[in-house]
Amino acid sequence: MIRKATVMKVYKDKYDDYKQRHDKLWPEMAEMLKAHGVHHYSIFLLEETGQLFAYLLVEDEDSFSEVAKTEICQKWWAYMAPLMETNDDLSPVSHDLKEVFYLA
């Protein structure tokens, strides 16, 4: 498995909405992620800044790179766009993190 981590940003007045939408993650979104080899996906919030830290395991980069091309992912991005910083295609503005330590 490949460990991935990224940071994003949710607007400070949208924390509750962000959590509620993820608490009710669309079943087809969860199914698509699993079908593309995504496991143990967690998102954490730093409330002081709105920074989100996402951590997930993926089976392989090629399969994971296909996630963004799916119709359901693009619908999810549009659904979440009012709550967070996004790019022109409505994908979240995100920055991949470089792993500097791991203890198995």
From Swiss-Prot:
Top-level taxon of origin: Bacteria
Keywords associated with the record: Carbohydrate metabolism, Cytoplasm, Isomerase, Rhamnose metabolism
GO molecular function: L-rhamnose mutarotase activity
Keyword field contains Cytoplasm: yes
Cellular component terms (Gene Ontology): cytoplasm
Main localization, broad class: cytoplasm
Matches recorded under SUPFAM superfamilies: Dimeric alpha+beta barrel (SSF54909)
GO BP term, pick one: rhamnose catabolic process
Catalysed reactions, as listed in the record: alpha-L-rhamnose = beta-L-rhamnose
EC number(s) given by UniProt: 5.1.3.32
Active site: H22
Pathway as given in its UniProt record: Carbohydrate metabolism; L-rhamnose metabolism
EC primary class: isomerase
Binding site for substrate: Y18, Y41, W76, W77
Cell location: Cytoplasm
Protein family (similarity comment): Belongs to the rhamnose mutarotase family.
Self-association state and partner proteins as the record states: Homodimer.
Stated name of the protein: L-rhamnose mutarotase
Lineage of source species: Bacteria, Bacillati, Bacillota, Bacilli, Bacillales
